């Protein structure tokens, strides 16, 4: 494939459009003015937006506030009516190292969206809920779905517990399965071998 010379940042990096409405059917993608580092651990922030108007508001607030602060991000927002029924209709990708720095800004955005009825109550399973309709999780890496990874772990635990109707046994199998992957069942929002300080983030979020 021929790439215009103006689109080449270096031999391995291509400059793409910031707004990409056709990258994945049913979703709108926006990226920051600053390149998102792909080799560093990422965080995912899930937004339970209530519909098309909420999607427009979220895109406007995120792009304006984070670009003004020169923070790198990718934003994936549903543009299909069916997807708005999900609690992960919008996902914001950020560097883990900078999450605490952007926490106050993201909290203000969530407050605005909540006041205007743009956020539902629920958040995706396994995430750390930080506000109404807003959940956080560490990106598992490898370009895989966070929810899929956790669901597969839970499924293996169910299979390993067999047909047992004993809740403690099922819980034990779940704990063992998650621990085998280096993840605590009590903190499923963290990735394997995580060093992320979620208490620091929550403190910054609440300021």
Which residues are covered by each model-predicted region?
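Structured alpha/beta or helical-core interaction and ligand-binding surfaces enriched in interleaved
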Residues: 1-207
